[in-house]
Amino acid sequence: MHLHFTPRQIVEKLDQYIIGQKDAKKAVAVALRNRYRRSKLAENLRDEIAPKNILMIGPTGVGKTEVARRMAKLVGAPFIKVEATKFTEVGYVGRDVESMVRDLVETSVRIVKEEMVVKVQDKAEEQANQRLVEILVPSPEKQSGFKNPLEMLFGGTQNSNQTTDSQEDVEIEKKRQDVERKLAAGLLEDEIVSIEVTEQQSSMFDMLQGTGMEQMGMNFQDALGSFMPKKTKKRKLSVKEARKVLTNEEAQRLIDMDEVTQEAVYRAEQLGIIFIDEIDKIAGKQSNSVDVSREGVQRDILPIVEGSNVATKYGSVKTDYILFVAAGAFHMSKPSDLIPELQGRFPIRVELTKLSTDDFVKILIEPDNALIKQYMALLATEGIEIEFSDEAIRKIAEIAYQVNQDTDNIGARRLHTIMEKLLEDLSFEASEITLEKITITPQYVEEKLATIAKNKDVSQFIL
């Protein structure tokens, strides 16, 4: 966990991936720092301080989800994104709002488990290598020293059998030491071995997903799992692949699942972040009799955000200190259309701005995972070096901005569509092109995109 970052450091880290939106970055940076500050307080005061939930307002594609996701990744906090429209009011078929907390705990368990596996990796690999040695040089089947009732009475051949067994054991030990040396030197990586692995059983309760009955299914499945033996199957793999499988199995045996569960529940409760997208879609008090009440969903979300106990397969989880980040475009509604109680639970309001042409230029070239860098890396695998002139990048940004203005504004996601269309022919012919270096010019961009971009009827289907 990395809760020690200062707000300024958090913003600087987010700047590496997200362009603009300073207000949103500052809000999440302060929220994260307050968690660190809270952890330093005396226990009686710490229990009184709950995180200040954030409401992000802005059109699609401006970075609402990415800000929250990168923030969680930065500190290693459990994070999930849910869509408010997927939930239904209690009493209707569909996902109940408590499932978001259960999903958060599952994410937390996965994170903690991965960390624990890393800690025992060396020991697990050592045990996996030992199993490989035993597979490559198996012990001979011991034959009974008694052939008939008379031998049983007088033990006629017992000593000779013991001598033979002792010689065989010495021979096997020598062979195993030799194999151990070869394994350590990497000389047997391509040898094929047959190993028994635990079979992943498909759950008969998968059909319950999305019906609001997942918890019942999971508990029933766990109860059955403790009685039913695990199935194993034989697989033929190279030593290299078998080592990975066996190391994973040994690591699972070495980690203490009770410790994993305890730490995971603690992290979910104290450090968890739940991002509720499209909250504007459940705002508004009008509801048709045919539709599931949107206000009812808000009222179901309210106790989770306020703080309550949610039953999960890992035990009861308190939601009092989970940070909730809600987001919505609020085109057809406004934050005040949410029920007053829910509004009060999101005291920090942040408005994200629409992206300009200059923002698009920065998005294309500045972030560590910039789109142009991605395409350059992809085509480099075919032996082609592509570069974009500054004028070409500006032209791409202008076209993306214009198409957003003329059709639906989908923010930075428009750049993905534009870039795919721009490099479509080049990507298709890359394996056959003999040129080692290609420069994308404004003329090339104009040729590939301008005609489509100017025709609104065509651009709304293609771009």
From Swiss-Prot:
CDD domains: RecA-like_HslU (cd19498). Keywords: ATP-binding, Chaperone, Cytoplasm, Nucleotide-binding, Stress response. GO terms for cellular component: HslUV protease complex. ATP binds at I19, G61, V62, G63, K64, T65, E66, D277, E341, R413. SMART domains: AAA (SM00382), ClpB_D2-small (SM01086). GO terms for biological process: protein unfolding; proteolysis involved in protein catabolic process. The keyword Nucleotide-binding applies. Its main location: cytoplasm. Pfam families: AAA, AAA_2, ClpB_D2-small. GO terms for molecular function: ATP binding; ATP hydrolysis activity; peptidase activity; proteasome-activating activity. InterPro entries: AAA+_ATPase, ATP-dep_Clp_protease_ClpX, ATPase_AAA_core, Clp_ATPase_C, HslU, P-loop_NTPase. It comes from the Bacteria. It is found in: Cytoplasm. Gene3D superfamilies: 1.10.8.60, DNA helicase RuvA subunit, C-terminal domain, P-loop containing nucleotide triphosphate hydrolases. A double ring-shaped homohexamer of HslV is capped on each side by a ring-shaped HslU homohexamer. The assembly of the HslU/HslV complex is dependent on binding of ATP. Belongs to the ClpX chaperone family. HslU subfamily. NCBIfam families: hslU, PRK05201.1. PANTHER family: ATP-DEPENDENT CLP PROTEASE ATP-BINDING SUBUNIT CLPX-LIKE, MITOCHONDRIAL-RELATED, ATP-DEPENDENT PROTEASE ATPASE SUBUNIT HSLU. ATPase subunit of a proteasome-like degradation complex; this subunit has chaperone activity. The binding of ATP and its subsequent hydrolysis by HslU are essential for unfolding of protein substrates subsequently hydrolyzed by HslV. HslU recognizes the N-terminal part of its protein substrates and unfolds these before they are guided to HslV for hydrolysis. This is ATP-dependent protease ATPase subunit HslU. The lineage of its organism: Bacteria, Bacillati, Bacillota, Bacilli, Bacillales. The gene is hslU.
